[in-house]
A protein has these predicted regions:
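Active-site proximal loop and beta-alpha junction motif in alpha/beta enzyme cores
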Residues: 1-233
Length: 233
């Protein structure tokens, strides 16, 4: 089933991917049923979303484009931009740009405490991202988590605030985890996000390997109807 084009517009700049909100609108169309696939038209292309029953709840999972791995960023430079010390950033994992449609620099931070202390100077951050960088946004992650079942604790802070759940970034993080050994190929892992924004979210991700390429990036979560209404245009 093909739905109408679905996108999301942010002030000043469009955040092109459908984020974790992709499964919600698909669920809300009434077309989403267990073991069914819905095809969404987003700005990054056609995104298939599949639904299945898990423990009596509807779980939606979208497949993103195969990832492109970009540049490695300097720890000291990034730390200075976001109000951290270079020692707050993990030295055993790279700060690397990954894109499945929107390019994120995945920034591995050592602890939840360091993540809570982020202070982005937007003038210099935008200058960096819009200058020589191949990333459009930063996605901050740490292997220290609040939930023992989670693999990463994440924050996505951008020019208009903080996003509690960023599916486009989580997909990039899934590819990054598989590429750098944080997750095994095809292992479904949990990313917790939105805790600092007091809107905790649970994003399930996985990615496969085909030869030396990361592929089959999947991002999902449980879709629950909380409101029903009509829009008159």
């Amino acid at each position: 089933m093909v739905l109408r084009e679905l996108g999301r517009v942010r002030p000043a700049r469009e955040h092109q991917a459908g984020r974790s909100r992709t499964t919600g609108p698909a669920r809300g169309t009434g077309a989403a049923r267990a073991e069914e696939e819905v095809l969404l038209h987003l700005n990054v292309g056609r995104i298939p979303v599949t639904f299945r029953e898990e423990d009596g709840r509807l779980f939606g999972e979208m497949r993103q484009r195969d990832p492109e791995f970009g540049s490695i960023h300097d720890r000291k430079t990034v730390a200075r931009l976001v109000g951290l010390r270079a020692t707050d950033i993990a030295s055993d994992l790279p700060i690397q740009t990954v894109s499945t449609g929107v390019a994120f620099a995945i920034v591995p931070v050592k602890s939840c405490q360091a993540l809570s202390e982020l202070q982005l100077d937007w003038k210099t951050v935008n200058s960096y991202l819009q200058g020589s960088s191949d990333a459009q946004f930063f996605y901050f992650v740490t292997r220290e988590t609040k939930d023992p079942a989670a693999r990463l604790h994440a924050r996505m802070i951008f020019y208009n605030g903080e996003d509690p759940a960023t599916g486009s970034a989580a997909g990039c993080a899934a590819a990054w985890m598989v590429r750098h050994g944080v997750a095994q190929p095809d292992e479904r892992v949990l990313i917790e996000q939105g805790i600092e924004a007091r809107r905790p979210s649970r994003i399930f991700v996985r990615a496969g390997m085909k030869g030396d390429r990361v592929t089959n990036v999947r991002v999902g979560g449980h879709a629950v109807e909380v409101l029903r209404g009509e829009v008159v245009l």
